[in-house]
Amino acid sequence: MSTAITRQIVLDTETTGMNQIGAHYEGHKIIEIGAVEVVNRRLTGNNFHVYLKPDRLVDPEAFGVHGIADEFLLDKPTFAEVADEFMDYIRGAELVIHNAAFDIGFMDYEFSLLKRDIPKTNTFCKVTDSLAVARKMFPGKRNSLDALCARYEIDNSKRTLHGALLDAQILAEVYLAMTGGQTSMAFAMEGETQQQQGEATIQRIVRQASKLRVVFATDEEIAAHEARLDLVQKKGGSCLWRA
């Protein structure tokens, strides 16, 4: 029987906004960090939560997502003031983050601004993208945090606005459910029904236009496209290309 201790930190951030072109983090700042500690698949209550003064204004679009106002952040510490405590908290742990590229990009950017030669986060933490895990488990389905809550019947009624600590707490429950065993029979049957319906629809299209060559996107192309849409939707609040 293994006695190894597994320490995971489920983490989320809120920011002043994001760039649609180029590096999504450049010129923007983290304004909230929420992290939940999980040891051997148990929530410990040893959480990390802080609001940060960004020394720049919050974009209106980002404010619409998380509701964190410029005035509220005026008396909060800067990232530089909490960086050491934050690094000590996450060092050596497995970070579980939904759409990890977004948050890790911001974290590495903030560390680089300190001019202290701090290495990339993935050199002192293992990084697990829970969105990538969900996509492997449920290909072709919506795998946003809200969609996963509905799938696993996890209460997210308090999530009227995005908040880093609340989102981290919800994600911790979701991730434990995702990695804890098989899903319910009802959900499995629902998935099979949807798959059968999808296959039937494809067959009808082929019969009606048998001479038309249909070129489908590869799995890699679909994954890359969905990743970009998730990045836009996660911190933009909405995505034009999704209903």
Swiss-Prot record:
Gene3D superfamilies per UniProt:
Metal-dependent hydrolases, Ribonuclease H-like superfamily/Ribonuclease H
Catalytic activity entry: DNA(n) + a 2'-deoxyribonucleoside 5'-triphosphate = DNA(n+1) + diphosphate
Q: Name one Pfam family in it.
A: RNase_T
- Residues given in the record as substrate binding sites: 12, 14, 61, 66, 167
> EC number(s) for this protein?
2.7.7.7
Q: How is the cofactor bound?
A: Binds 2 divalent metal cations. Magnesium or manganese.
Q: Which UniProt keywords apply?
A: DNA replication, DNA-directed DNA polymerase, Exonuclease, Hydrolase, Magnesium, Manganese, Metal-binding, Nuclease, Nucleotidyltransferase, Transferase
Its needed co-factors are: Mg(2+); Mn(2+)
Task: Give the GO terms filed under biological process for this record.
Answer: DNA replication proofreading; DNA-templated DNA replication; lagging strand elongation; leading strand elongation
Annotated Gene Ontology cellular component terms: cytosol; DNA polymerase III complex; DNA polymerase III, core complex; replisome
Q: Where is the active site?
A: 162
GO MF: 3'-5' exonuclease activity; DNA binding; DNA-directed DNA polymerase activity; exonuclease activity; metal ion binding
Disulphide bonds annotated for this chain are none
Q: What does the entry list as the binding residues for a divalent metal cation 1?
A: 12, 14, 167
**Residues bound to a divalent metal cation 2:** 12
Quaternary form?
Answer: In a ternary complex this subunit contacts both the beta sliding clamp (dnaN) and the polymerase subunit (dnaE). The DNA polymerase III holoenzyme complex contains at least 10 different subunits organized into 3 functionally essential subassemblies: the Pol III core, the beta sliding clamp processivity factor and the clamp-loading complex. The Pol III core (subunits alpha, epsilon and theta) contains the polymerase and the 3'-5' exonuclease proofreading activities. The polymerase is tethered to the template via the dimeric beta sliding clamp processivity factor.
Q: PANTHER family this protein is in?
A: DNA POLYMERASE III SUBUNIT EPSILON
Question: What this chain does, per the record?
Answer: DNA polymerase III is a complex, multichain enzyme responsible for most of the replicative synthesis in bacteria. The epsilon subunit contain the editing function and is a proofreading 3'-5' exonuclease. Contacts both the beta sliding clamp (dnaN) and the polymerase subunit (dnaE), stabilizing their interaction.
Q: Report what the protein is called.
A: DNA polymerase III subunit epsilon
Q: Which organism is it from?
A: Escherichia coli (strain K12)
From the broadest rank down, the organism's phylogenetic lineage runs: Bacteria, Pseudomonadati, Pseudomonadota, Gammaproteobacteria, Enterobacterales
